[in-house]
């Protein structure tokens, strides 16, 4: 299995950043050929080919964290809206919502959301959601 490291760029040779810059020029369509890209950034083609498959910038999507909660909502007007408002106030960005039809006036809801900018803790959010009128059985299903 391959091992990966997160290393401060100041610890790496300058060519690593130039290889990433050359790849960006090619991917963005600013240049059409490798020879043009390496000339612009100031490295040799050999250096580019040596490192191109091994150095990458972190993916911004990887920095996001997701959580999934399940809860039961009473079938009354405005309860889901209040749940969403509470999530928004905590800076939780909703990714998916799945609500089943109400049975005996209770609907099961499962929500996934991005917590990378969450204000407060997940426990605080779960508690706030559980305190909303018409909301019960709030459970944190998973966090990634």
Curated annotation (Swiss-Prot):
This is UPF0735 ACT domain-containing protein LCABL_12100. SUPFAM superfamilies: ACT-like (SSF55021). Belongs to the UPF0735 family. Coiled coil: none annotated. HAMAP family: UPF0735. It comes from the Bacteria. Residues 68-143 form the ACT domain. InterPro entries: ACT-like_dom_sf, ACT_dom, UPF0735_ACT_dom-cont. Gene3D superfamilies: 3.30.70.260.
């Amino acid at each position: 299995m391959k091992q990966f490291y997160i290393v401060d760029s100041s610890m790496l040779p300058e060519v690593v950043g130039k290889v990433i810059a050359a790849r960006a020029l090619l991917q963005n369509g600013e240049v059409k050929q490798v020879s043009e890209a390496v000339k612009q950034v100031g490295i040799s083609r050999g250096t580019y080919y040596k490192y191109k498959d091994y150095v990458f910038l972190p993916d911004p999507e990887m920095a996001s964290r997701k959580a999934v909660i399940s809860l039961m909502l009473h079938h009354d007007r405005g309860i889901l809206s209040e749940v969403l408002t509470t999530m928004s106030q905590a800076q939780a960005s909703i990714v998916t919502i799945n609500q089943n039809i109400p049975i005996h006036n209770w609907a099961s809801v499962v929500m996934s959301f991005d917590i990378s900018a969450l204000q407060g803790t997940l426990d605080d959010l779960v508690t706030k959601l559980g305190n909303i009128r018409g909301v019960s059985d709030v459970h944190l299903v998973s966090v990634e």
